[in-house]
Amino acid sequence: MRKIKKFKIPIYSYEILRKSRKAGADLGSVGLDNDRDFKEYVSQLASAIEPAVVFGYFPTDDPDTAVLSYRDKKPLTIAMLTLGNAIYEKTCDETDEARKTVIITAVSVFAASATKVISDIASQEAIPEGFELSEPFYIYSCPEQTRLSINAGKKDNSSMPLFSIEQEEERNDLNDQEMTLYRDDLTRALFRRLEAGKIGMSLDGNSIMPKYSSIFAFEWIVRKNRQNR
């Protein structure tokens, strides 16, 4: 298990601006339609985040991650990421809808940037072994990223199923509550195994705290040049 606290992430102000406009935020009404003013506001938001992560390697036969198995099961690196409490409190305190939209959009972009940093770090363990990491797939995310559903049938081209087709057929008699229990059991196991409390993450009933947190995994994939040998 590895732990990294208060690591640096790139801040993509233009991406936040583009997505905020796409989300319908009236930036002119709050004086954020100027690129310079918007960038300054995003910098203020970035100063309120405290990225922290724990992550670790899970082999193909790990019993706690059996729920994540695929038709061709692979080893996994699983990470638990939080952006801290302050940025969520900032969202709650904001009364203007346009600014609130910008904050939530910024948090989503910050989290994606942090995930990329984590991927680059975790890859340093995989590459010497002849592997590379897949794109992340999300077990939990707030705000919601491109994310898998607990039901494999709800996948799209940009996310990976939580269960393989065979498993989904075996479990098609389960209701939503029973399916949720699979994810809850996995979440509790990951909190314990990755010692998420060391970065301030906790379970409040079925809620993950701090609110702006995520749990995601990378598959270990054999590198193409190794496959061709």
Whereabouts are the PLM-identified features?
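Conserved mixed alpha/beta catalytic, RNA-binding, or beta-rich assembly cores of soluble enzyme
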Residues: 70-143, 148, 155-156, 162-166
